[in-house]
Amino acid sequence: MKLRHLLLVLTSFAIAAGQPGSKAIVVNLDTAQWTREKGAANGSEGVMLRTDSATGGMDLLVRFPAGHVIPPHFHESNERIIVVEGQLTLHQDDGDAVVNAGGYAYLPAREVQRLSCTSKTRCGFYLSWDGKPESHPAK
């Protein structure tokens, strides 16, 4: 159920963002329009940064409360994560990887992932997909 909410949030942000042209895009965290979607966990919010009408790719900033877990899932396109605040743990079949603020993770398309905010404070991270971020639940 949480994954469905995440998918709804991502889709809603994508629709709200529209399709940028060839102009530069600048977003400052202190003035960004953070949005909380109905049904999302308390403290979960996001800001759509960019969508690509040709590829379906997108860039997104998200924040989740401490302890929040995103259940196992995979995407149809490659995903990049840069942790902006807090600590994110990436749980995979071959072990866990802790990504601290300033850290980076690359997840190839169709690789199963489970993410959790393992810091005592909220987690904030930048997400980028090079194609549509279609997400599918995994076991």
Where are each of the predicted segments found?
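Ligand-binding loop in jelly-roll beta-barrel domains
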Residues: 44, 109-134
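Structural recognition of the beta-strand scaffold that forms the well-ordered cores
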Residues: 48, 72, 82, 106, ...
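Bacterial N-terminal signal peptides that target proteins for export
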Residues: 1-7
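Conserved hydrophobic/aromatic beta-strand scaffold that supports enzyme active sites
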Residues: 46-48, 59-61, 80, 96, ...
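Conserved short histidine dyad/triad with adjacent acidic residue
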Residues: 55-75, 108-110
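Short acidic-glycine-tyrosine-enriched beta hairpin
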Residues: 54, 93-112
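Glycine- and acidic-residue-biased ligand/ion/polar-headgroup-sensing regions
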Residues: 65-68, 75-93
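A short, N-terminal "cap"/entry segment at the start of jelly-roll beta-barrel domains
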Residues: 16-56, 138-139
